[in-house]
Amino acid sequence: GLSGRFVRIDQKKYGKILLPLITPYDENEEIDYGKYAELIEYVITNDLCDSLIVTGTTGEASLLTFDERVKLFETAVKASAGRKPVIAGTGCASTKETIALTNKAYDLGIELALIVCPFYNKPTQEGLYLHYKTIAENTKANIMLYNIPIFVGVNLEAETVGRLAAIPNIVGVKDEAGVNPTQVTDFFLATEKVDPNFVVYNGDDIMLLPTIVQGAMGIVSGGAHIFGHEIRAIFEAFEKGENEKAKELFVPMYRFCKT
């Protein structure tokens, strides 16, 4: 069943709060890699998260070149210096390019890739399945699927996630389906018999509490740059059974994210 998922997550390397780093630019719109290293230092020193994500949606991945993304991976690995795990956002519209970028990240020592559904082309569910299957078969990295229909144009359906969970190096999914906050439960139901260790992360700050209640292992939170400690307090309250406290902590965050 779905109970007991919470106790297992602490043994996981990546923790509950995955922070997708913003990408800093200078006044000429060139990436400021020095500032990026400083940001990583700030986030780690202040313990705002458990893991760092490089070039996710918050990092404006779709605006970066292949080489810029690789250089950001290198910068993050060096700056974090093993203190917190680094996860590489390697999703591209093209399957081939995604494989190449994922393997670059893996060669730099990044074991987990967060791979967004191929955007703009609106693939079918079978197309999504084949995209991820092909990537998984051509990399040693572990893969976290990333569903964000508002930007991709297609929802990664629970049935497809269930099929993908059977592939050994596809280990989890990040769900940002704001239109369907209960999809987290659908993902659990689709995967629990296929891979009981398959992890489901929420990807939307305003859905933090509703998805924790459904059993989400954690959150991918851009807001953690600002309120990482508050997110941690919400998790802790919920795990202690202090539901009223969790709600009290969540409401101001919800209001902030809504504005």
Question: Where in the sequence are the language-model features?
Answer:
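Catalytic alpha/beta core domains of metabolic enzymes, predominantly
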Residues: F151-T259
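Universal eukaryotic N-terminal targeting presequences
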Residues: G1-R5
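Active-site beta->alpha loop and helix N-cap motifs at the rims of alpha/beta catalytic domains
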Residues: F6-N155
